[in-house]
C-alpha cells in the first residue's frame, strides 16, 4: 500500500500552504516507520477534497483523497493509478492492488443505496469476482441487515450520530459466513464508517469517510 501513501504527496508538494506542508511531513514520518497516518482535524476541514482513512487487510491506515465521481460512483485514486471504487460506503471495485475486487453484480439493489430506508431483515443477493494470491475467485453472496443501535462517532473533530447496521453475509462455494458493519449518518444517510470484506470472507477493508463524497 506504499504507492497509495506516496500518491498523497503529489497533491501537496506543488504550491503547499504551511498547513499542507505540515501534513506532508506527517505522511513522510508515518511512511518510514509504518505508523498509522493521522491528519489533524483542522487540516482535514481545510482541504477542499473528499477524504477518508483506509485500512486494507489489517495493514497500515492511510489517508486517501477522492479523485472523481463517475456515474454516482466515487473513485479514489493513487499516483500509480491504483483505484478504489465505492458507492455510499460500499466497496464495488479495486484496481492495481495486490488483491482486487473485480466485479459486484446487482449493486443497484444494495440497501445502502437508500441507507435511511434500511429495515431489519432487508436482504441483498449478488455475485462477486475477485483476485486473491494471483488466482481468480467468485462467489454468490446473500446478505441480511439488522439494526445494532445508535452510536456517536467523532470524525475529524465533529460528532456524528450514526445508525449502526450489521450485515450478515453468507457465501456459497466457498461456504463462509461473516459480518460487515456500516455506520450511517442518521441525518444524511451517508455511510461514515464501514468494515467489510473485499472477497468472500477474506481481505478486510476498513474505511472512515472524513469528508464524504457529495
UniProtKB/Swiss-Prot annotation:
Family recorded in the similarity comment: To E.coli YjbF.
Name the InterPro entries on file.
Answer: GfcB, YmcC_sf
Q: Which UniProt keywords apply?
A: Cell membrane, Lipoprotein, Membrane, Palmitate, Signal
**One term under GO cellular component:** plasma membrane
The record places the lipid (S-diacylglycerol cysteine) at 16
Please tell me where this protein is predominantly located.
membrane
Q: Which residues form the signal peptide?
A: 1-15
Instruction: Tell whether Zinc-finger is among the UniProt keywords.
Output: no
Protein's name in the database: Uncharacterized lipoprotein GfcB
Supply the Pfam families for this chain.
YjbF
Where is this chain lipid-modified, annotation N-palmitoyl cysteine? 16
**Taxonomic superkingdom:** Bacteria
Q: Which organism is it from?
A: Escherichia coli (strain K12)
Q: Does the keyword Lipoprotein apply?
A: yes
| Location of this chain's protein in the cell | Cell membrane
Topology within the bilayer: Lipid-anchor
